[in-house]
Amino acid sequence: MYKEAMRAAWSEINVTNLDFNIKSIKEKVGPGRKITGVLKADAYGHGAVRVATVLRANGIESYGVATLSEGVRLRKAGFLLEEIIILYPNPEPYADVIVENRLSPVVCDFKNAEAISKAAQKQGIIIKGYVSIDTGMGRLGYNPDDSASIEDIK
């Protein structure tokens, strides 16, 4: 009978090193440049709220998350003014939640953009969104050769 071996494995983040790394990146990119801290998968297991707190302390006010629930979790943790970008499209029924939480969605088709626009109009809120362009992998996003469909979402 095979029994899977158990081993101790973990990941730790040194906040002092993270702080140093952020300062180094900011120095390299220069003043006035926007940096977005990616916090997908609970900051890759390091704790999104903990990492976002260090990012905010270093003047980074834009965060990328993979899912709607990750974005909502950051809002509920007190990240109310920062831009939170949902890096993957969400189904149209969730447009109201995106708008209520003032999250910045990625849109990859007209139907998705229209649902978010209608939800924002209904709530009287302007939402900043990002248009996803398919860069050749064929996973998601507008085809850059189809500029007419991209124009439709303006």
Residue ranges and their predicted role:
Residues K28:
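Conserved PLP-enzyme active-site core in the AAT-like
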Residues Y2-A5, A9-E12, F20, R33-K154:
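Active-site-proximal beta-alpha core segment in soluble small-molecule metabolic enzymes
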Residues L18-N21, I25:
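Alpha-helical packing segments of well-folded alpha/beta enzyme cores
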